[in-house]
């Protein structure tokens, strides 16, 4: 078949559109091999000005993964495609191995995707049907049932799935016609994994009974996606009224909504923060245990690597971090200090900064600590001594932020909470002063 009459090539060309800088997720399996071959054909035979880079993610889950990496690198060399490989650690504790591998893979994609590139992956129509059925098994709503969009925002660009209208049968036929070689992952035959069970046992029966089943499911997924897009459009203005510059939600305004509308807004809040979608039961717990908790409580509810917190009648979605209250970090001041937990960098600045304090004396050792619990404290700008809790409250510092603000000590004397306050002991009067800048991540 001539390339110009090939439905698969034409579909890739249509979906790629005007994008020319492309990062291809390449596992060496038949799907991604066909996708990459199709893009190479568009570059070489259609003369499209495509700049192709393939990335192989080594999950470390299969003893053959090193051989697969070599296979992919060899193919890219022959096809004159730039090649990247990345080894990742898979965390399967929370969502299982499949989800952990996917999260690690897409994190690698984020790491290497350039601002002018789009990410292209090889999911096809049968994958879409399997994703729909898995979402149905979980009891998902329209958002989950919409499955995988052909195009979606990803980092600063887009993620494209140009094979979603192409069947597995078409892909394999193309591979055989063009004499392509690909990797067969033996784990794909392990029906302990839900997706493999569907592909090996359920989909063949459904397709035998209804040959166009995958196509029909893909159409239903698209309709669910359209409904979600319409809801996004209708609720966007109201969501913007609920959210402030810190991406927190106004509980008082949210409480005026019906439960159905409130849940829809909460889901869109999670999506806006690029977090995994909460379940219906999780949304109920969020509202009852966090939003409606007693006024003097400090409620929290964990969602994977984040947690929802409440402060001053607003909901915040914040990352869970390692406890730092026992850490004491020495700092010479002559070099920038990289803070733990990706909290940023401290540096002595000659230009500007919010924290100006006295310079340490020769016999004073400078350390950085976290978590202030002083019973009595006097700070610049306040006449009377106050407890640290009272000071945090007066400065409107949320409880979870209080243990993440770097505290500057000279020996065992608190000098400043960076970007927040300076103590009387650290006040720069007639003495030599320094300016500390915190470049938060």
Swiss-Prot record:
Catalytic activity annotated for this protein?
cytidine(34) in tRNA(Ile2) + L-lysine + ATP = lysidine(34) in tRNA(Ile2) + AMP + diphosphate + H(+)
The primary location reported for this protein is cytoplasm
Q: Which GO terms describe its cellular component?
A: cytoplasm
Q: What class of enzyme is it?
A: ligase
Enzyme Commission number, as recorded: 6.3.4.19
The organism's superkingdom is given as: Bacteria
What's a single GO MF annotation on this record? Answer: ATP binding
List UniProt keywords, sorted A-Z.
ATP-binding, Cytoplasm, Ligase, Nucleotide-binding, tRNA processing
Where does this polypeptide localize?
Cytoplasm
A GO biological process this protein is involved in? tRNA modification
Q: Which residues bind ATP?
A: 27-32
An example Pfam family from this entry, by short name, is ATP_bind_3
Q: Which InterPro entries match?
A: Lysidine-tRNA-synth_C (IPR012796), Rossmann-like_a/b/a_fold (IPR014729), TilS/TtcA_N (IPR011063), tRNA_Ile_lys_synt (IPR012094), tRNA_Ile_lys_synt_N (IPR012795), tRNA_Ile_lys_synt_subst-bd (IPR015262)
Name the family.
Belongs to the tRNA(Ile)-lysidine synthase family.
PANTHER family given in the database record: TRNA(ILE)-LYSIDINE SYNTHASE-RELATED
Per the entry, what this protein does is: Ligates lysine onto the cytidine present at position 34 of the AUA codon-specific tRNA(Ile) that contains the anticodon CAU, in an ATP-dependent manner. Cytidine is converted to lysidine, thus changing the amino acid specificity of the tRNA from methionine to isoleucine.
Per the record, the domain comment is: The N-terminal region contains the highly conserved SGGXDS motif, predicted to be a P-loop motif involved in ATP binding.
Family annotation (HAMAP family): tRNA_Ile_lys_synt
* Name the UniProt record assigns to this protein: tRNA(Ile)-lysidine synthase
Organism per entry = Proteus mirabilis (strain HI4320)
State the taxonomy lineage: Bacteria, Pseudomonadati, Pseudomonadota, Gammaproteobacteria, Enterobacterales
């Amino acid at each position: 078949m001539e390339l110009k009459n090939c439905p698969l090539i034409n579909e890739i060309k249509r979906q790629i559109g005007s994008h020319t800088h492309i990062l291809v997720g390449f596992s060496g399996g038949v799907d991604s091999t066909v996708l990459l071959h199709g893009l190479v054909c568009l570059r070489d035979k259609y003369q499209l000005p495509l700049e192709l880079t393939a990335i192989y993610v080594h999950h470390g889950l299969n003893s053959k993964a090193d051989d697969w990496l070599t296979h992919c690198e060899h193919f890219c060399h022959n096809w004159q495609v730039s090649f990247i490989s990345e080894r990742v650690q898979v965390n399967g504790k929370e969502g299982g191995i499949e989800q952990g591998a996917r999260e690690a893979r897409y994190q690698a994609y984020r790491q290497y995707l350039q601002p002018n590139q789009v990410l292209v992956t090889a999911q096809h129509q049968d994958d879409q049907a399997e994703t729909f059925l898995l979402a149905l098994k979980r009891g998902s709503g329209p958002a989950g049932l919409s499955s995988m969009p052909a195009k979606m925002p990803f980092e600063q660009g887009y993620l494209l799935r140009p094979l979603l209208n192409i069947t597995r049968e078409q892909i394999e036929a193309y591979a055989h016609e063009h004499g392509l070689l690909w990797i067969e992952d033996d784990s794909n035959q392990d029906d302990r994994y839900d997706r493999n069970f569907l592909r090996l046992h359920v989909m063949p029966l459904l397709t035998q009974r209804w040959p166009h089943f995958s196509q029909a499911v893909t159409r239903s997924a698209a309709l669910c996606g359209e409904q979600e897009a319409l809801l996004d459009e209708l609720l966007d203005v109201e969501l913007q009224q609920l959210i402030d510059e810190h991406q927190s939600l106004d509980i008082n305004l949210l409480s005026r909504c019906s439960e159905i509308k409130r849940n829809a807004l909460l889901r869109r809040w999670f999506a806006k923060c690029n977090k995994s979608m909460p379940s219906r039961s999780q949304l109920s717990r969020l509202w009852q245990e966090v939003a409606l908790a007693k006024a003097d409580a400090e409620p929290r509810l964990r969602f994977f690597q984040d947690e929802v917190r409440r402060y001053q009648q607003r909901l915040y979605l914040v990352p869970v971090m390692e406890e730092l209250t026992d850490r004491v970090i020495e700092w010479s001041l002559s070099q920038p200090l990289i803070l733990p937990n990706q909290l940023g960098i401290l540096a002595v600045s000659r230009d500007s900064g919010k924290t100006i304090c006295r310079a340490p004396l020769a016999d004073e050792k400078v350390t950085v600590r976290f978590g202030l619990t002083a019973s009595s404290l006097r700070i610049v700008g306040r006449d009377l001594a106050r407890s640290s809790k009272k000071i945090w409250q007066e400065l409107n510092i949320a409880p979870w932020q209080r243990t993440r603000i770097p505290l500057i000590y000279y020996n065992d004397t608190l000098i400043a909470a960076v970007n927040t306050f300076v103590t009387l002991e650290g006040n720069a009067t007639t003495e030599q002063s320094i300016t500390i800048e915190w470049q938060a991540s």
